[in-house]
Amino acid sequence: MFTPCSFSVALPALKAGEILCLACGADDVPAGASRAIAVVRPEDLPANALPVGTVLGAESGALLKIEGRAFWPGWERALFLARVLADISSGVRILKTARAGCALAVVTLSDKGFAGLREDESGPALVDMVRKGLPLCHERRFLLPDEPARLRALVLELAGQGYDLVISTGGTGLSPRDLTPEALIPVLDRRLPGFEQVMMAASLEKTPRAVLSRALAGTVGKTLLFALPGSRRAALENLEVVLEAVPHALEKLGGDMSDCGRK
């Protein structure tokens, strides 16, 4: 569950559209860093206070939006990457955090797509479906080859950045390169068999070949994860039947303690 906070930071002059790096817990900035970097004292910023999609604002309105994080070579601390939403003059400001909606990442796994030999149709379609069913504060798409290690590393990084919902498409069949379940099951904290069963049932209504699907659902920390088939049609059919339950699942992952039973 997102907890708003406020902190003081000295900002350089910035133009809308630029990227600002926020460094937490540093006495100085990495050698060679550009001017677009600001330092926040660790005591001013609670842990996990800046998940992706967080908006930082002042009295004048929204100024920055967290879009990710990066690591400077040879420097241990993560840098938060913030998109500048409005022109900013240099000076010290009290920034307040706010976050409305969920952060979505869609990862398409396709050797041919990654090589530029096939257009990704599933990824954009999945984003559109989620956008129609959920309010989003941030969205991003990724395209990877069918390489388990790269997928596993990306999913762990996305969960660490605070993405609420991560959906992969591709690699759930029986071909030699279909290794998405093998990549993701080891990093799941919990499998969600109910979601998996509903997706399988919906697919079997369309074709008996759906028995070959190894689509899965689970959690990585507070991130909800779905691994869907690579076919655009199959991926959308799977997502459609579970999307209604996603908001409730995200609330529970965020710490909602209310009863789940219907009255």
Task: Write out the residue ranges for each language-model feature.
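Glycine-rich phosphate/diphosphate-binding loop of Rossmann-like nucleotide-binding domains
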Residues: R93-D146
